[in-house]
């Protein structure tokens, strides 16, 4: 909540019915303040009083801001347009607002900022945070704002700012520039100087170049902020031609500077730019010319002056320029036109019209031309022509070919002998165009620029090794590579003295290398020629042909000359082209090691190929050498749990398969990708129709025995075990279109079409006729990226979490995340928090620019930040956030007691011992209390999970794809449509219960509507939804899922079914066969597993045959186990997962030696009821088993003092043997504080950004909701120069 909203709260309101107050707006009596927030407006409304001083238009759908909408407001001082969809702002928009002092355009879609005024204006505060801004031109933006005090450009896409942007701003005291991908070259020197003069909220960090990444701009040495001096290539007559040698890749656009100001070829006479070459007048002082490059292409908005355009003939808004590209590269050209009626665009190459094809693809209404690969025959003159009924325009430009030369090493490293303790320098120099990059490796392992005693020079040409040891003896390889090839050279280091180092792998001498190369040439040259002919003639008909092509795209000279880039591009192109043509790959032939490069390519060169491609296998491998620590405690990412196979169960690794995947092409495309394809004679049904006809229910039946806590604990456990990583982009890789604006299957978009009879289409609530869906990200090494792992494999998906039940949802799945959650101010081993409840108990800390999933429901009036937790989904719904809060409180409660009992323990020991106890609590509650309930009894659980027989290191605990994507999602069938909120009297609180869709991503309601107690009581004192086959998912999940965050609300059933197809899960019947269950061949056979004939008829109408039923659908409709919540198929998959998760965990709480017998005795006392009693604010009544529902009357619930409590005395002086490395961990812990995002004034809570009056008040105290302030956590002085500046 910002200053404007706070001020508005101070005055009386009347509804918008009088003159000067538009409909849907609220105004004060004099019309000075007008609030049109949340009104669904698409433009500024008419009828606003000319006396208006403050105009608030937050949370609307305004997409264009034009001057005519702002005429007639001569007294307007504050304009708030946050949370709209503004993409276009007309030039000089403030010319009609002579008194405007505050302008907020945050949380919009702006990419380019035009000139805002043509004459001086008294603007004091400008907020542009959280847009998509990539370019700001100082010549217009800030030229007329001498009174500007504050500017916020944070959370945009700005790489650099022009050098004069902040000149002539004498009043500027606050500039927020963080959360931008800064390119730290000479262009940020002015930014650095500015940051030293003004105040800022958070530091701005470099993103590029790599060697400066994560360094704060204001702390970088100025000598490192470099631009390159160009080389003089030639001069003719009155012109110089200069070449920027810094640009090593055509994918990085060159930026030219003259006298430290960027050169713009569209506005400076006499300059001509072609890629990395600039032609300048001879009178130019070339000593003042420098160059650098952007790391991502800055779009055409960089030099576009946007304006409002009415009906008329076509007019170019962006014209493509002449350019040059390297052979084999991808070319993307934008030609953008506006006009009404909408113009049609036609393309010509050398005067000949062409249509979209695989080689030359046209997208986005023909606005975008893509050419891949760009070859000599593609060069020439291109014309973009736009026509409508009112006229025609055309523009012609050239695309030229740049010659490329593969690297040639002219000075290679020489073998050398050196004494122990000495120093050696290997030199490697190569020529090529583009300039080669260098990669050094030692016995197959890549050497970083600085790695211990190894150091690579800045240009990569030298490798220096100091203080040589015997283990450094071996072969060193230098590979020089550019986009068109690579070459390598090897040298041997012999270390004199000490014992002879035994090589782990046999070494190949020069004679053997020559023999291998000769044989390889004989075998490969003829095979390559043959396969190229097959490629040209489209004769690839089976997997073996494809495998031969993969192998023979390797280089002719296997040792001396390795064209790594050619291998990669040729192979990927081959996969893409022939899979697109319909090639079917047999899974049995593809997995696991059937297409190896190693027979013709040295392992060091394979390593180099992987490095150059940028593709790595998830986690960096921990050597697990810290045996003291790893014997006592878990790592955060799961590594070193299994000493024999340390990557088992680790985060950021592929999900495990129970059955081979089913992809339409056998490789990577999901079932349903190709429209109309038949399976067993029938097309697969539209998943939305399955949801509507079979899964959705408007009525629910309460469970007679179980409480809603069963559902909530299941979700909490799931978020400790599984989180499938989805595609990073919402844009189609092929066309660049947003996934929510296309219904075509274009990676990563796999959207679900809506039928004409769909209620969303009929009601016109769907802006686009499909539900948005992005595919899960593929693990590098599968699908398209598999080639750099020396084999072709089918697509696999990644689990971002550890597969162990280890409380990673409390502590995080990596060490960086864990440090974010710790209180490192005090050496007390506690978790961090920012505010407390009225009972003095901690709430979750607020996130601060983290990766928490927080699609905020910003229609609410209390926009606090989201909570931070070990799992990024903690804000997903209110009851989940309350459960997370319980465990933060329990950790800190235990940590305080351990500290009191063991005064000699430091914070690191307290933290890890407490974390170990919390993990054991989760394991005990899950296996002893929760799993027997969902399986329908201990006997059923023992049948499917089995009893614990001890740790088995041969077991892989990794989560299975079927478990994460289908089986464990049975929990969606037991979710109530309402979150109950009950007070101490077990009646509804005054704010009432809350519909589920209103509980999504609304963490502010935890703080403002009763805290966590009502939510927790609503879980253990309300009945679970019964998962009846005819009542599966409630309508809150089918029609209103995350409806505030999406233009088309999601459908959870649709997500589940589509995700299982995306992951290639086989059908329901195949998993029944895997589980040794009877497999239905006909619909009549289904009656043994599904009792309701109507459900069988619906399945038959949707799927045609039983063999087509999706796993999740079949699993939720089959007959349940007696007293259980799922049927035998899901019981098989879930039981297998929990059994392996337990038996393959070296730190399982029941394993001998993990806890002492005395400690185990106490852990067995743990119940979730006790945790709720200890950590709720005022929970004093509860049933002993919170998963059972005793009824709604208060008398059915016993007192907390009657529940058994764990005695922590068993941990007194238990763990004094501290590992030495734990002291290092304390020192490495990042010292971070907790900033409160708000303040307290006269006992009243003021949210972040609110202005307080009278002047000189300070934000000094923590706000304790529902009680007076408790402690001082923040002091913020308000200087006189700040009082008129506002943070929105």
UniProtKB/Swiss-Prot annotation:
LRR repeats lie at residues 27-49, 50-72, 73-96, 97-120, 122-143, 145-168, 204-227, 356-381, 387-412, 998-1022, 1049-1073, 1168-1189. Transmembrane segments: none annotated. It is found in: Secreted, Extracellular space, Extracellular matrix. It comes from the Eukaryota. GO terms for cellular component: extracellular space. Its main location: secreted. Binds 1 Ca(2+) ion per subunit. Ca(2+) binds at residues 720, 802, 804, 806, 808. Residues 180-228 form the LRRCT domain. Residues 17-51 form the LRRNT domain. Glycans are attached at residues 247, 594, 740, 857. Residues 314-400, 407-494 form the Ig-like C2-type domain. The record marks 873 as: Transition state stabilizer. GO terms for biological process: hydrogen peroxide catabolic process; response to oxidative stress. The active site is at residue 719. Keywords: Calcium, Coiled coil, Disulfide bond, Extracellular matrix, Glycoprotein, Heme, Hydrogen peroxide, Immunoglobulin domain, Iron, Leucine-rich repeat, Metal-binding, Oxidoreductase, Peroxidase, Repeat, Secreted, Signal. GO terms for molecular function: heme binding; lactoperoxidase activity; metal ion binding; peroxidase activity. Residues 1-16 form the signal peptide. Heme b binds at residues 718, 876, 972. Its cofactor is Ca(2+); heme b. Gene3D superfamilies: Haem peroxidase domain superfamily, animal type, Immunoglobulins, Ribonuclease Inhibitor. Pfam families: An_peroxidase, I-set, LRR_8. PANTHER family: OXIDASE/PEROXIDASE, PEROXIDASIN. Belongs to the peroxidase family. XPO subfamily. Catalyzes the two-electron oxidation of bromide by hydrogen peroxide and generates hypobromite as a reactive intermediate which mediates the formation of sulfilimine cross-links between methionine and hydroxylysine residues within an uncross-linked collagen IV NC1 hexamer. Plays a role in the attachment of tissues and in axonal guidance during early developmental stages. May functionally antagonize the peroxidasin pxn-2 to maintain neuronal development. This is Peroxidasin homolog. It comes from Caenorhabditis briggsae.
